[in-house]
Amino acid sequence: MLSKSPPNPILNRATSQLYPPGSTFKTVVAAAALETGQYQPDTQIPAGASYTLPGTVTQLTNAVPQADGADGKISMEDALAYSSNTAFAQLGVSLGDNAVSSMAKKLGFDSPITVDGSDYTGTPWVSVTSKFPTDINDDKLALASIGQGDTVVTPLQNAMVAAAIANDGKLMQPTLVDRVRSADLSVISQTKPTVMSHAFSADTANKLTQMMEAVVTKENTNLAINGVQVAVKTGTAQIGNGNTSIDGWVIGFAPADDPKIAVAVVVHNVDLYGSFAAGPIMKAMMQEALAE
């Protein structure tokens, strides 16, 4: 039976499969930092070519030299654009467990998310719960802050993070059904947009949008769409024994200045960075949606 097949071919992975989010989680850490009022996109934060996890001999490094910064520091915007592991690991530790986990919870982590349609669509279902670890030591907090360790998400959760940034910090209730029509095509019911929480301020959302646009303009130009401003964050989560494989991610929305679509894409068990594994899929989805 397909339902018992090891690859789980009929599993709804958007709502029922957890993946490490990799660097897409840096958007959550950035939101937590911006909300304190002590950070701006141009704020210089500690970075460097390597960072030793507190209390260990394990070192984090970066994928590209631009992520190291200069003289041990990098701007928040460049840290996100070049996906600086050393910067965001240190930023997460500096903010502390409570600040990062609180922002994650405001964005839907650690709570089941009900996917609803309307009164006429049958029984709603509940997604599996995305998780950010709490009450952890700084070494684990550093890893969790770059979307590794015990941080796990559903694709739905990551799409909701992107949508919250696009919606001025408002986390929206996900729904599959826009409206229900009768046999004569008259509208029986229509789903109304519902705000689940105000995760962060519109000012923070605007600054995050600016930073996510820089992800495209400064580092991932392959994700650019002609005539459209695109805001994204890529992710390359290491998985498997010895971290030998990758879950490639990209989350984002467009147009950045007037959002119409928010997307999360994950490609499991590949050997490509998220920008190249998931990026073309996101780009095609955005182009198709914006062409309608």
Named regions from a protein language model:
Residues 186-194, 280-292:
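Short, gly/Ser/Thr-rich active-site loops of penicillin-recognizing serine hydrolases
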Residues 219, 257, 271, 283-292:
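Intrinsic structural disorder
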Residues 267-279:
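A short acidic/glycine-rich loop-to-helix N-cap element
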